[in-house]
Amino acid sequence: MFLLLQLTLRQDEQGLAIDLFEQQDLNVDRSGRGSRSRFIENLRKHCGSEDGVIIRAGSSTDVTVGDIRATVGPVRLFSVDGGHTEMLTANDLALAAGALAEGGIVILDDHFNPYWPDVAAGLGRHIFVDRSPLRPFAITPGKVFLCAPEWSETWRDALIKAFPTAHEKHSEMYGAPVEILGLGRFSLRSEADRHVSQLKAYVKTRPALAAFARKVTGREE
C-alpha cells in the first residue's frame, strides 16, 4: 500500500514510512517481518527511487502527531498497517486522525482478516472509546477507508464515479454510510459466498461438528 501512496505524491510532498524493519524484538504480535533494504529496493523498482521518502525505523508508539506534522506536514493519505493488536491499531489510528489534512483519508488494512481480529477491535476502540473524529466511508477487499464525516459524501461519490463497475452496494458501518466495492475478480459478495461454501464443505467432513451445527441452527442439512 505504501508504494501506491508514494506514487500519488505531489511535487511538494514527501512520504513518511514508519516500520520496525529489523527491530523484530518489538514486534509483539509477529504481524510482519520488515526489511529496510528490501523496502528501499521496492521503492527503487516501483517508484523510481527512494527520494521523497523519509524512513523512520522504530515503533509507532514512540511517534507523536507533532512528529509527523513536523516531518511531512498534514497528511492527505495515511495507511495503517502496523501492529495488529487492539491497542497498537487504536494507537496508529489516533496518530492518523491527528495528522490528517483537511479532507484526508485513512486506509486501515486487515480489518476483516479472521487471523487478526484485534484490528477490528482496535477500530471499535478508536471510534467509541477514544471518540475518533473519523468514520468509515468505504470498504474494499481487506481494507476500510475512513475520513471526517463532513467529507464522507464527497469521497463516496468520487469512488462510485471512479469505479462504477466495482461498486457492489451501499451499507452502514458504526452508524456511518459506507460504499462496498470489489476489485477486479475480487467481489466481496462472491468472496463471502465462497467462504460459506468452504465452511459447509468442511463441516460435512466432520460428523461431530456437523451434528453440533445442526443442533445450533435447528436445521437438518
Question: Where do the model's predicted regions map?
Answer:
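S-adenosylmethionine/decaboxylated-SAM
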Residues: 1-218
